[in-house]
Design a protein with these regions (language model features):
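Terminal helix-turn-helix DNA-binding modules in bacterial transcription factors
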Residues: 207-228, 238-258
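Amphipathic alpha-helical segments enriched in hydrophobic/aromatic residues interleaved with Lys/Arg
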Residues: 2-18, 118-175, 179-180, 187, ...
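N-terminal, Lys/Arg-enriched amphipathic/low-complexity engagement segments
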Residues: 9-47
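Short, hydrophobic secondary-structure boundary micro-motifs
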Residues: 35, 188-192, 218
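Conserved hydrophobic/aromatic pocket- or pore-lining residues that grip, position, or stack substrates
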Residues: 60, 176, 209, 233
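A ubiquitous short alpha-helical element
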Residues: 51, 135-143, 193, 221
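N-terminal regulatory/effector-sensing and dimerization cores
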Residues: 32-129
């Protein structure tokens, strides 16, 4: 038993090294490095940072090395080379790079999640139903596996053969979505993608509020977008974002002002 665990850990470390090498090869500039694959960006950072306000969109960020802190409504999440960050909704957060240097830069892969692709995977795969809870925040940190790391490495390696991107990139992205959905954090993503349930309807209200943050907030109007009562929406909204709709709007306005 212990031997199997040791072999699994060794395999994860080996694939993570390959992912770090792939990211480093294609992320030559500091900060964000857009790629020829739609929705895929690679990051290289060499210094710690102060807290920065930013808005996460539905996405998965896989870390190969370095360390980062995320603050969502007073709840802290820490990401390092053994983890991935899942954001299933549009949400304002504070982020801070904790560990990064010239010798060991923070290297990560950002992939925007395409909800039609998520629904496509859900319709074809026999995945277990998630336990829906208001404690299922829209942001979560999970542990990377050989399967997830390997799929991410293969997606980045497509950049070396651009002619393969149109055919293979979608297939590999479907695998990445599948790996996330099979993880303990997958229920969060499934709940958002599944039409009709409270999380999906709340996400619709969140998207509307982000698009209309400059307007005065009227809870009755927002509740109508979500097709639920005001008190239910308030409860669900706080469950996903760790803040009220008004606090969410203020965070968006603050970020825009900066």
């Amino acid at each position: 038993m212990q031997g199997n665990v040791a072999r699994q850990r060794a395999a994860v470390i080996e694939v993570r090294k390959q992912l770090a090498s792939d990211i480093a090869a294609h992320a030559q500039s500091l900060g964000e490095n857009p790629t020829a694959i739609p929705g895929l960006a690679l990051y290289r950072l060499t210094t710690p940072t102060a807290c920065l306000l930013t808005t996460y969109e539905p996405s998965v960020t896989v870390f190969a090395q370095g360390r980062k802190r995320i603050n969502l409504g007073g709840i802290e999440y820490f990401c390092d080379g053994s983890s991935f960050l899942l954001s299933s909704i549009d949400v304002p957060v504070e982020s801070q790079i904790l560990e990064a240097s010239e010798q060991v830069p923070l290297l990560s892969m950002f992939l925007r999640l395409d909800m039609p692709t998520v629904r496509e995977v859900l319709s074809r795969e026999d995945l277990p139903e998630p336990e829906i809870s208001v404690q299922n925040r829209g942001v979560a940190v999970g542990e990377t596996t050989v399967g997830l790391l390997g799929a991410c490495a293969r997606l980045i390696e497509l950049l070396e053969t651009p002619e393969d991107i149109p055919f293979l990139s979608h297939l590999i992205q479907r695998e990445i979505v599948y790996r996330i959905l099979r993880s303990p954090q997958g229920g969060r993503l499934r709940a958002i993608a599944t039409a009709g349930n409270l999380s999906h309807r709340t996400a619709r209200a969140i998207a509307w509020l982000r698009a209309n943050y400059a307007k005065p907030l009227r809870m009755e109007e927002l509740a109508a977008v979500a097709r639920m009562g005001v008190s239910t929406l308030h409860h669900q909204f706080r469950g996903l974002t760790a803040m009220s709709p008004l606090q969410y709007q203020k965070q968006l306005r603050l970020q825009t002002a900066r």
